[in-house]
Curated annotation (Swiss-Prot):
Its cofactor is [2Fe-2S] cluster. Keywords: 2Fe-2S, Chloroplast, Electron transport, Iron, Iron-sulfur, Metal-binding, Plastid, Transit peptide, Transport. It comes from Zea mays (Maize). InterPro entries: 2Fe-2S_ferredoxin-like_sf (IPR036010), 2Fe-2S_ferredoxin-type (IPR001041), 2Fe2S_fd_BS (IPR006058), Beta-grasp_dom_sf (IPR012675), Fd_pln (IPR010241). NCBIfam families: fdx_plant. [2Fe-2S] cluster binds at residues 83, 88, 91, 121. Changing residue 109 to D: Increased affinity for Fd-NADP(+) oxidoreductase and increased electron-transfer activity. This is Ferredoxin-2, chloroplastic. It comes from the Eukaryota. The keyword Amino-acid biosynthesis does not apply. GO terms for biological process: electron transport chain; photosynthesis; response to light stimulus. Its main location: plastid. Residues 47-137 form the 2Fe-2S ferredoxin-type domain. The gene is FDX2.
Length: 140
């Protein structure tokens, strides 16, 4: 009965105004919820990324907004890394086919990128891609 009385009193209450604590909570909550809805509605591409490692080949479905190294680690794949910022060559690999966006890296020069070198810590897939990993010694 108390629950019914409480809900009935809420229904009979006058419409909330901006000075009402309830209205204030609603006004604050709406802007926080809106970005989450937009994020959930964002279309996201995923690409087949094949990593050719010394231990064998691994295929992953990597989202287009996640670094290849980060996703591989989440899946339990051990890849070399050091800086995680694209400013060294520890995670260097060689693109066999496909393409990546590695505009966040600062170590490789234009010729090395054109030759297919990739830093997996700063590379997003932009198509299905095959990458030979553990190639730092070949790069240097």
């Amino acid at each position: 009965m108390a629950a019914t009385a409480l809900s009935m009193s809420i229904l009979r209450a006058p419409p909330p105004c901006f000075s009402s604590p309830l209205r204030l909570r609603v006004a604050v909550a709406k802007p926080l919820a809106a970005p989450m809805r937009r994020q959930l509605l964002r279309a996201q591409a995923t690409y087949n990324v094949k990593l050719i490692t010394p231990e064998g080949e691994v295929e992953l479905q990597v989202p287009d907004d996640v670094y290849i190294l980060d996703f591989a680690e989440e899946e339990g794949i051990d890849l070399p890394f050091s800086c995680r910022a694209g400013s060294c060559s520890s995670c260097a690999g060689k693109v066999v086919s496909g393409s990546v966006d590695q505009s966040d890296q600062s170590f490789l020069n234009d010729n090395q990128v054109a030759d297919g070198w990739v830093l997996t810590c700063a590379a997003y897939p932009t198509s299905d891609v095959v990458i030979e990993t553990h190639k730092e010694d070949d790069l240097l």
